[in-house]
Structure formats: structure tokens, C-alpha cells
UniProtKB/Swiss-Prot annotation:
ATP-grasp domain span: 119-308
The enzyme's E.C. designation: 6.3.1.21
Protein name per its UniProtKB record: Formate-dependent phosphoribosylglycinamide formyltransferase
Lineage, uppermost ranks: Bacteria, Pseudomonadati, Pseudomonadota, Gammaproteobacteria, Pseudomonadales
Enzyme class: ligase
HAMAP family reported in the protein's UniProt record: PurT (MF_01643)
Database matches in InterPro entries: ATP-grasp, ATP-grasp_carboxylate-amine, ATP_grasp_subdomain_1, PreATP-grasp_dom_sf, PurT, PurT/PurK_preATP-grasp, PurT_C
Reaction catalysed by this enzyme: N(1)-(5-phospho-beta-D-ribosyl)glycinamide + formate + ATP = N(2)-formyl-N(1)-(5-phospho-beta-D-ribosyl)glycinamide + ADP + phosphate + H(+)
GO cellular component assignments: cytosol
Top-rank taxon: Bacteria
Function summary: Involved in the de novo purine biosynthesis. Catalyzes the transfer of formate to 5-phospho-ribosyl-glycinamide (GAR), producing 5-phospho-ribosyl-N-formylglycinamide (FGAR). Formate is provided by PurU via hydrolysis of 10-formyl-tetrahydrofolate.
Length: 393
């Protein structure tokens, strides 16, 4: 049976979080509610999750030796990656030595790289995906695009939040897309995936949680992206029963293959009753921020329970709900947010400000949340709230 000790004592249950953005911050808050001792690690100081953890370390998490040193110093019971850009080979070694990585080190390694997870889904599991090719050079990228046809997508195999992604409408776009992908990759210049276009009706995130009692699914989350970056999400996304059943089949297959415990954000394309696998994150998903108001147990509460081996007997969806991001553009280390009385004036609205220490360019700094009697009404309410936030740099 699971047991949780006293934080900052010899009996403490220690979790080391790798990556301290807004998703990690909400997870730490849920872990704190269970009395877990949390150590937060990221490449910069005062990251959001560090502000609610017991202590923190600043290091380059792609540096395997530095990551190993802090893990051996802290001796956590669980290592929980919150981002892709981690020395996953070191996590594999540490897992072999007896550490527990959530959900598994293999899951972190495969999903850090679009090639690993795409080959698992399409070639090993036989799941429907968009047609694709990988390319290491501009010439290979051009050949792949010409073979797949236009429009098509070019993405770095290692990136997140839409960085380095572009849509090619013709062969005239290939050179610029290649350079953009090289600039946007997490590990610098390198391999890209070229994907054929799928004419889908909508895309969803199916939040899938593997826990002590089995596998559970949240209601599907619909979302709107711009340049690969989430702008809005809503729950529940209406789906044909056959499409929802197929989405669950695909999500179950890929999460079973990855194994371990925790929440997974399974991204899927849907057209009518057809469903295609797109990507998977073995951790809370940014589009799942809507669950802060749409469910009795948010994706972060579900992840915390799953990690700790606690039961998840039911997930209650509370009705139409939506999220809309608060974007800040400019240069500042002292951003302030005003007009909050108007932001929160409507019933059933909420606001989360992430507390990020600065902005350089464009950055997601908060999210507005809303519930209403329909998805459209909830979306409009969330968008109004987000737009009402007054930014001062």
C-alpha cells in the first residue's frame, strides 16, 4: 500500500521534477497537498515550479553528468520529467540502477524525439498516422517534400511548443522551412520529419492516465493551435461515438507500449469516424490546462495520484469549459498584469498567472479559464477574460 512520509524529515517521500514551467507548477501544488517533498530542477532560476517547491537546482538538464550529480545528491523516490529536453540516456542508466522514472525512462527517451515515437506508433504498433519521411539534409528534405506532395509539414525531430515547425505550400518554401527547423530544434541543427497533410476536421488531446487501478480517459479536449503553439482548448470536444472509441483504442495501444504510471497527452487528428495518431507527451499537456476548471480532478491531480500509486476511481467532467492563453510580447523581467477585476467579473471564470521571471520575444505567461452552458459560450468567455488582461512590461 502507498505510504507518504513527512517532508523535510528522514521519512519524506521525495520527488525530483525535471522542468519547472507552468505545468510543473500545477503538479507541484498537487504533490504539496499530499505532503510530498519536491525538488525542482530547471536551466534557469525562479522558474514557476521552483516557486512552490521545497528547494531547487539550476542546471543544464541535457548535461547527463550534472543531472546525475543532482539526482545522486537528492536521492528522490521518483524522477518526474516535465519537458522533453533532458539527458534521457542518463535517465535510462539511473532507472537501471534502481531509480523510478515517471512514467518510464524509455517513454521519456522515445518521446523526446519525434522519430522514436512515430516509428513506435506507425511501424511497431501499426497505428494510423500521417505519411512521413525523415531528412538529415536540405536535399533529403526537398526529396521528401516532393514525394509527399504539397501542402506538407516540416518539423525538427526534437522540439516542443511548435518551435521550428512550418507548412510548405510549394517547393519555393522548402529552403526557408529547412532553415527554420534547424533554428527551432531543441538540440540545435539536425534531423527533421516531413509529414504529409491530413485533411482533418479537428484535433484533440485525449488525456490518458495509467494508474494503480488500470487506464482511465478524460473527456476529449479540443484545441486551436497557431504555428504549432496552443492558443485555446476546450472540453468536452463533441465526437462521434465510433471516433471516440477509435481514439481510445489508439491511446490505449501507445500508452500500454510506453508503460509506467502517470498521465499522457495523446494528440490525435479526427475526420468523421477516422482517427490518426499525431504525437504523445508522457506528462501533463498544455491543452489540458482547461482541466483546472473542467474536471473534479485536473490532469495535474491525476498525474500526482498516478505517480504515488493512489486510486482514481472516477474522473468527473463538470460541463462545457475552455481555456485561452495570456501571451506577453516584448522584453521585461518585471511584467505586471492589471485590469484583473474586469478579467474575473463574469461568473465561472478563473485566471492563472504563471509567475515566469521574464519575457524576451513572445511568451505564454498565463491562462484564462471559464465554464458555461455550451462550448462556444465557454470559449468566448475565456477569450474575453484573456483579452481583458492589461500587460505592463
Amino acid at each position: 500500500m502507498p505510504r507518504i512520509g513527512t517532508p523535510l524529515s528522514p521519512s519524506a517521500t521525495r520527488i525530483l521534477l525535471c522542468g519547472c514551467g507552468e505545468l510543473g507548477k500545477e503538479l507541484v501544488i498537487e504533490l504539496q497537498r499530499f505532503g510530498v517533498e519536491v525538488i525542482a530542477v530547471d536551466r534557469y532560476a525562479n522558474a514557476p515550479a521552483m516557486q512552490v517547491a521545497h528547494r531547487s537546482h539550476v542546471l543544464d538538464m541535457l548535461d547527463g553528468a550534472a543531472l546525475r550529480a543532482v539526482i545522486e545528491q537528492e536521492r528522490p523516490h521518483y524522477i518526474v520529467p516535465e519537458i522533453e529536453a533532458i539527458a534521457t540516456a542518463t535517465l535510462v542508466e539511473l532507472e537501471r540502477e534502481g531509480y523510478t522514472v515517471i512514467p518510464t525512462a524509455r517513454a521519456a527517451q522515445l518521446t523526446m524525439n519525434r522519430e522514436g515515437i512515430r516509428r513506435l506508433a506507425a511501424e511497431e504498433l501499426g497505428l494510423p498516422t500521417s505519411p512521413y519521411r525523415f531528412a538529415d539534409t536540405l536535399d533529403e528534405c526537398r526529396a521528401a517534400a516532393m514525394a509527399l506532395g504539397f501542402p506538407c509539414l516540416v518539423k525538427p525531430v526534437m522540439s516542443s511548443s511548435g518551435k521550428g515547425q512550418s507548412v510548405l505550400r510549394s517547393d519555393a518554401d522548402i529552403d526557408a522551412a529547412w532553415e527554420y527547423a534547424q533554428a527551432g530544434g531543441r538540440a540545435g541543427r539536425g534531423r527533421v520529419i516531413v509529414e504529409g497533410f491530413i485533411d482533418f476536421d479537428y484535433e484533440i488531446t485525449l488525456l490518458t492516465v495509467r494508474h494503480a487501478g488500470g487506464t482511465s480517459f478524460c473527456e476529449p479536449v479540443g484545441h486551436r493551435q497557431e504555428k504549432g503553439d496552443y492558443q485555446e482548448s476546450w472540453q468536452p470536444q463533441p465526437m462521434a461515438p465510433a471516433a471516440l472509441a477509435e481514439a481510445k483504442r489508439i491511446a490505449l495501444a501507445v500508452t500500454d507500449a510506453l508503460g509506467g504510471r502517470g498521465i499522457f497527452g495523446v494528440e490525435l487528428f479526427v475526420k468523421g469516424e477516422q482517427v490518426w495518431f499525431c504525437e504523445i507527451s508522457p506528462r501533463p499537456h498544455d491543452t489540458g490546462l482547461v482541466t483546472l476548471v473542467s474536471q473534479d480532478l485536473s490532469e495535474f491531480a491525476l498525474h500526482a495520484r498516478a505517480i504515488l500509486g493512489l486510486p482514481i476511481p472516477v474522473i468527473r467532467q463538470l460541463g462545457p469549459a475552455a481555456s485561452a492563453v495570456v501571451l506577453v510580447e516584448g522584453e521585461s523581467t518585471q511584467v505586471s498584469f492589471g485590469n484583473l477585476a474586469e478579467v474575473l467579473a463574469e461568473p465561472d471564470t478563473a485566471l492563472r498567472l504563471f509567475g515566469k521571471p521574464g519575457v524576451s520575444g513572445q511568451r505564454r505567461m498565463g491562462v484564462a479559464l471559464a465554464r458555461d452552458t455550451s462550448i462556444d459560450a465557454a470559449r468566448q468567455k475565456a477569450l474575453r477574460a484573456a483579452a481583458a488582461v492589461k500587460i505592463e512590461l
